[in-house]
Amino acid sequence: MKMERILKVFDSNYVKLSRPRCPELYFASDYFNEIFDSLKSLDYSNVKQGIPRDKGIYFWFVGEQVNYIGIAKNRNGLYGRVALQHLNEKYLEFRESKQNPELDKFQLSQAVQTLDAEGNAKIGIDKSTFRKKIGRKFKLKPGSETVSYIKENGTLKFTTINNIEGKSLDLIEATLIAFFQPPLNTAHTGAVVTKLSSVPVGQEVTVLK
């Protein structure tokens, strides 16, 4: 896949992130361009061996469009988020309190059925936020159907970002979601990214570390 057009979107020296009820932040554009320069495509036929347990960020592309962005900052890193959750058809939500009767109406009608330890019936839908968004939008069954859709319709790219605090990863995610506005991301509503040639006098560049 040719990425040149996407790689050059941050063609200014700096970017400003504006969010409701938050101070404006300024970042060097080169940092984000380096993220794209280091992206690797995940081999869907070898998911568990193809993705590390490091912290990082991942993108789901449909063609050249960024359709979903996520970060991984917990103990199992990208491996835990992508391999064990998003692309694991057995990663399902059986807790009724976490199932939305309206938004999850279709998946609930096609839910995976099983029994709990006491022999009571329970039903499960997608637990992965990424798969849940896809299932709701395209009316796909939980589990194998949403996993197959991800693999068959887009390319998942990722890069590791080590030696960084979780809050900085959150800012990276917020900036990229605000800029690309992926259709499957609903977080960071109201955030705006502005490209700048210079930082205003009196403002400092935030170092992501």
Indicate residue ranges for each PLM-predicted region.
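Boundary/linker segments flanking structured domains
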Residues: 1-67, 71-209
